[in-house]
C-alpha cells in the first residue's frame, strides 16, 4: 500500500511538471547602430548588450531595432541562442523585430512575419505610420517536456496614432487565429511606443495580462523603460511591455534591468524580463 501511495505521489508530481513549466522572457530594444549616437554608438556598447543577454539567459528574447550586423554579432558571440525573423523592408540594414531562443531547449514548429498594415502579408505601411512595422512570431516546443508556446515580438510606429491603434487590433486578431490553430500559451513582447494610458493600448491590457501589473511578486526596479541614453535624468515612461494569455499563464516575477557601465546604459531602452508559468 505504501509503495502504491509513493507511486501515486510521484505520478502527480511528474504530471504537474509536465503540464506546467516556467519560462523567462525578455524584451529589449537594443537601439540600431546609428552614427549619430557618439559615445553610445553600437561599436562601443555592443559588448555590454551581448553580456547582458548572455547573463540573463532568457528562454526567449524579443529584440527591436536590431539590424543584421548587430544580430550577427550577438549570435556569433553567444552560441546558446538561435534566431528567427526577417527585416521589415528589403533595404540595407533594415530593422528586425526578431526572436532569440535557447536552441538546445526549444524546437521551432512554425514561424512567420507579418506587417502591421492593411495588407499584413505584404511589405509596406498604412494609415499614418512613418515606417513599415512588423510582428515576428513562432510556435516553440520544449524539447524535453513537449510544452508549446506561441511567442510574438513587435515594434509599434512612433508617429502614427491610427497606425498604433490598428496595430493593436491586428495583433489581437492574429493571436485569436493562432490560438484556434493551437490553443497553447501566448507571449507578446515589444516596444509599443505607447504608455499604458494610451487608448489604443486598452484592448491589449483587457485581452491579455501585462507582466508588470500582474506579477505575483513585487516588480523589481524602475517602471520606466525608455532612458534615451540620459544617465543623469530619471526615466519617466514605460513603453516596452510583455504580455501573456490570461487563461493559461501566470506571471511570477518581473524586472526592469537598469544595468549600466561607466555611467552609460547599454541601450536607450531598459530591457525587461518576466518569469512566466505556462499552464
Regions found by a protein language model. Give the residues of each.
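N-terminal, active-site-proximal structural segment of metallo-dependent hydrolase catalytic domains
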Residues: 2, 18-77, 88-95, 169, ...
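Sec-dependent N-terminal signal peptides
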Residues: 5-17
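Active-site-proximal beta-strand elements of phosphoester/diester hydrolases
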Residues: 22-34, 109-114, 147-156
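Acidic/histidine-rich helix-loop elements
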Residues: 27-47, 116-130, 157, 228, ...
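Catalytic metal-binding/acid-base residues of hydrolase active sites
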Residues: 31, 67, 155-157, 192-195, ...
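Structured beta-strand-rich core segments of catalytic domains in phosphoester-bond hydrolases
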Residues: 60-152, 255-256
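Active-site neighborhood of phospho(di)ester-bond hydrolases with catalytic His/Asp-centered motifs
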Residues: 61-64, 85-86, 187-191, 210-213
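Metal-dependent phosphoester-hydrolase catalytic domains
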Residues: 105, 162, 166, 176-186, ...
Amino acid at each position: 500500500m505504501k509503495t502504491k501511495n509513493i507511486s501515486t505521489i510521484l505520478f502527480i508530481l511528474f504530471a504537474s511538471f509536465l503540464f506546467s513549466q516556467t519560462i523567462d522572457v525578455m524584451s529589449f530594444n537594443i537601439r540600431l547602430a546609428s552614427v549619430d549616437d557618439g559615445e553610445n554608438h553600437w561599436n562601443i556598447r555592443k559588448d555590454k548588450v551581448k553580456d547582458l543577454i548572455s547573463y540573463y539567459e532568457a528562454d526567449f528574447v524579443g529584440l527591436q531595432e536590431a539590424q543584421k550586423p548587430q544580430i550577427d554579432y550577438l549570435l556569433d558571440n553567444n552560441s546558446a541562442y538561435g534566431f528567427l525573423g526577417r527585416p521589415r523592408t528589403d533595404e540595407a540594414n533594415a530593422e528586425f523585430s526578431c526572436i532569440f531562443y535557447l536552441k538546445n531547449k526549444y524546437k521551432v514548429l512554425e514561424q512567420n512575419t507579418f506587417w502591421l498594415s492593411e495588407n499584413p502579408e505584404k511589405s509596406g505601411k498604412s494609415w499614418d505610420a512613418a515606417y513599415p512595422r512588423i510582428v515576428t512570431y513562432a510556435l516553440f516546443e520544449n524539447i524535453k517536456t513537449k510544452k508549446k508556446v506561441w511567442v510574438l515580438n513587435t515594434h509599434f510606429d512612433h508617429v502614427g496614432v491610427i497606425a498604433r491603434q490598428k496595430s493593436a487590433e491586428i495583433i489581437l486578431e492574429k493571436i485569436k487565429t493562432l490560438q484556434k490553430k493551437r490553443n497553447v500559451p501566448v507571449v507578446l513582447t515589444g516596444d509599443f511606443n505607447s504608455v499604458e494610458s494610451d487608448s489604443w493600448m486598452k484592448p491589449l491590457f483587457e485581452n491579455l495580462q501585462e507582466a508588470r501589473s500582474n506579477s505575483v511578486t513585487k516588480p523589481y526596479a524602475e517602471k520606466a523603460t525608455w532612458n534615451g541614453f540620459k544617465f543623469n535624468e530619471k526615466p519617466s515612461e514605460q513603453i516596452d511591455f510583455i504580455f501573456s494569455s490570461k487563461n493559461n499563464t501566470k506571471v511570477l516575477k518581473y524586472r526592469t534591468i537598469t544595468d549600466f557601465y561607466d555611467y552609460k546604459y547599454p541601450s536607450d531602452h531598459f530591457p525587461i524580463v518576466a518569469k512566466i508559468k505556462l499552464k
